[in-house]
Amino acid sequence: VERKLISSKCEARGRVYIIDLLQFTNGCFANISEDQNGKMGAITVSIKTGERATSSSLIPESKGSIFAGMIGELLADKLHGIAVVSLYLREELDTDSMKTLINEVRKLLKKD
C-alpha cells in the first residue's frame, strides 16, 4: 500500500495554517489547522460516487463546516475515493483565505 504524507505551511491575511495530506491509493486524510502545533478540529467525510462527490459532517463546528466539505469534495473528486478532513480554526474564514487554502491544497495534490 503506497502512502504519502505531504505538508505545507500557508499564510492568508496574517493567519498561519498547517496543511497535512496523508494520501492512500483510494483517498486521503487531510488536516488543516490554524495552529503551529497542528490540532484536530471538525471532521468531515467526503466520497466520490459516480460523477459527484458528497460530504457529511461527523464532528460539526460553527466555524468553517461548509469549507471543510468543499475541501473534502475536492480531494475525493481528484483522488477518486474517500477524503476525511479535519479543520481546526480559531475564527471564521473569509473568502480570500478560503481561496488561498484551496489553491494550496491543489498545489499539494500536484506534488503527487
Task: State each model region's role.
Residues 2-78, 82-92, 98-100, 104, ...:
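Conserved mixed alpha/beta catalytic, RNA-binding, or beta-rich assembly cores of soluble enzyme
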